[in-house]
Amino acid sequence: AYTKGKPHPMIDPEKRIECMESAVDDESTGVILLDIMLGYGSHEDMAGALIPTIEELKKKAEDAGRKVFFVATVCGTRKDFQGYDEAVKKLKDAGVIVCENNKLAVRTAIQAIGLDFEEPVKEIRTKKTAVVEKAEPSEKLMQLLSQKPKIINVGLKSFAEVAEDFGCEVVQYDWMPPAGGDVRLIRTLNFLRNYEGIDEANKRVIAKVVASQPVIKHVKRAKEVIPQIAEGKVILHAGPPIEYKNMPDPVQGSCVGAVLFEEWADNEADARALLESGEVKFIPCHHCNAVGPMGGITSANMPVFVVKNETDGNEAYCTMNEGIGKVLRFGAYSEEVVNRLRWMRDVLGPTLDRAITELGGLSVNPLVAKAVAMGDEFHQRNIAASLAFMKEVAPTITRLDMSEKDRYDVIKFLADTDQFFLNIMMATAKSVMDGARTITDGTIVTAMCRNGVEFGIRIAGMGDEWFTGPVNTPKGLYFTGYDEEDGCPDMGDSAITETFGVGGMAMIAAPAVTRFVGAGGYEDALRVSNEMAEITIDHNPNFIIPTWNFQGTCLGIDARLVVEKGITPVINTGIAHKIAGYGQVGAGTVHPPMECFEKAIVAYAKKLGFEA
């Protein structure tokens, strides 16, 4: 199927030109047969589109001392808009032998290369007359013949446009073959669709998501709750595994900031020398029950939210949000950035820990349910959830024994940081999805993340294995003075929110976000969410979206559906400058590479005993 994934040659000359060029390069080729189709749905001037190549190839063959004949038929009428006579004339003027029918064209082609063909004598049979009983046509048939038809057009839109021009009522159905027509993937999908137990396993995975009860338990220094980081020089990073030398510049900049924060070096030069020496160990956050925004850089003394999934008993961790602009997660490492981190370590973290402990923990589901009804999608818009969180902790903070300056600074920071809840949402989603992936079967996506070079996903049935592909650069809106040339390829563990069903998956909950990320308006938000529902298997009844006819958020990205439908999850994201130190320069959306999902389903099918 050399036209797989491409328009038919009667529509687009590209593949036909490629085949002609290949044929002329073959010294055994003496004649090339062509058929030119006229009419609606065909190229507006296929003869004219092919002639430059035909003339070039004829000359190429002549220069090589060879003779290559071009023989063609033109299938159409003088009423076709391309013009039958015009097409024939163009071909003949270019030295093409034009025949009236395919039979004559084949005979001409054979004779052109010095061969002959004797057509066998066909048996003449007596015509048998069929006797058919005359039937009265039905009312529906008469309507079809006497009225303009109502048409559902599948595939090429130009057919629908022609019917509309004639006044027909037309519905355009956009269809494409499963998995883009890839036979290997179609066989894999058929196997996984029919394999007993996968659908039930997927339902068990999402049932765990719905049943989860995440609770913010503490804010602790990372080394107190993450054993892998407690000793030595260890830095956690976002995304699948990556070496320091391969990290994009903003992530390396974040590492410099972490080294300065931990006081492993006194200046940038010494920090970079330390990082390049190999003395610092790098581990993906996901390998430590943690997640991190953007670069994801987490070191021993950074305060992290501790979110416990009370249903399954597991915990997840995430650093606190620093605010916007020049911040560590976007690659900045100035003195201002490092001093803010120290304040978060010494004041903000301990204050929130005391408040949350006094409250006996803070259940997250009610905060999310409340905020989604107030217009948050929990990746680019978190203002309602951030204020709801502050509403819970602020009264307790006012009673804590602490300096008035520190008290004011903490509450002011919470009030000013619209995105503060994002990191809580990330830890929440991680705790929930880690609990759900204790079901070790099925095709539900349990993690999505990126490190600035690779995008990685996990699915329930393949445990801890990463399936990766080259990361994309976000498309969106840039701050004044910046454009796409300044953007860094996508990075961060924050796509765990989309894995959970919010963020870009819940765009309709926050239509205002579509403008901020350059994705349009309300209709675009609705379209995106409806499209995301096509690749998930259910809706989460815990988080109802009023602007989506009170449907729940998307629940359970099925890797099979992603590959089958050719739809990848949409992820809302910030955009870092490609050079460390500039910080955030915009916001937009990004999609994972389809390659990740294809690899995942092929590997899972293989695990179950199938080889495509």
Placement of each model-derived feature along the sequence:
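Anaerobic metallocofactor- and corrinoid-dependent redox/one-carbon enzyme cores
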Residues: A1-E18, P52, G76-T77, P120-A612
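ATP-dependent carboxylate/acyl-activation modules
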Residues: A1-L34, G39, F69, C75-T77, ...
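Generic beta-strand/beta-sheet core signal
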Residues: L34-D35, T73, N101, Y173
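Charged helix-capping and loop-helix junction motifs
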Residues: M46-T53
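A short helix->loop->beta-strand "cap" motif at the edges of active sites that frequently abuts
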Residues: K59-F69
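Short, structured coil segments at secondary-structure junctions
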Residues: K92-G95, F166
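Short acidic-hydrophobic, aromatic-tinged amphipathic segments that line or gate anion-handling sites
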Residues: I97-A105
